Amino acid sequence: MAENREPRCAIEAELDPVEYTLRKRLPHRLPRRPNDIYVNMKTDFKAQLARCQKLLDGGTRGQNACTEIYIHGLGLAINRAINIALQLQAGSFGSLQVAANTSTVELVDELEPETDSREPLTRVRNNSAIHIRVFRVTPK
């Protein structure tokens, strides 16, 4: 799989931070289901944990409890997603199990020129993601 491509450092050398502004696009998300939780680093950990627990317990207005939830983490939020899943499992006294899948997500960055003499560019990069299924185990 030998490809003739420019080395990454050569491409980076062409992009002068004075000439271009980096704009990171939002990652592509699948259609959101009621039992999907997207974890990020901006929201408080306890708030995200409470939201997951609320979904599993059934909420406040007599809603049906979810039998499973999916916790999604991207990049730096992977550790937080794992921690939330493990906290939920530890607090359930054995009634919850977790199953994790990892993937790679393609992200697109826009490089907007500061002057009109240059063309706008896009750059594609990969980032790691985790998808954790937290589900109730039926007692035997």
From Swiss-Prot:
Keyword terms of this UniProt record: Cytoplasm, Nucleus, rRNA processing, tRNA processing
Keyword tRNA processing among record annotations: yes
InterPro entries: Alba-like_dom_sf, Pop7/Rpp20
Localisation: Nucleus, Nucleolus; Cytoplasm; Cytoplasmic granule
Stretches of the chain forming a coiled coil according to its record: none
A single GO molecular function term of this UniProt record: ribonuclease P activity
Family label: Belongs to the histone-like Alba family.
Quaternary state and interactors: Component of nuclear RNase P and RNase MRP complexes. RNase P consists of a catalytic RNA moiety and 10 different protein chains; POP1, POP4, POP5, POP7, RPP14, RPP21, RPP25, RPP30, RPP38 and RPP40. Within the RNase P complex, POP1, POP7 and RPP25 form the 'finger' subcomplex, POP5, RPP14, RPP40 and homodimeric RPP30 form the 'palm' subcomplex, and RPP21, POP4 and RPP38 form the 'wrist' subcomplex. All subunits of the RNase P complex interact with the catalytic RNA. Several subunits of RNase P are also part of the RNase MRP complex.
Reported function: Component of ribonuclease P, a ribonucleoprotein complex that generates mature tRNA molecules by cleaving their 5'-ends. Also a component of the MRP ribonuclease complex, which cleaves pre-rRNA sequences.
Record protein name field: Ribonuclease P protein subunit p20
Protein's gene: Pop7
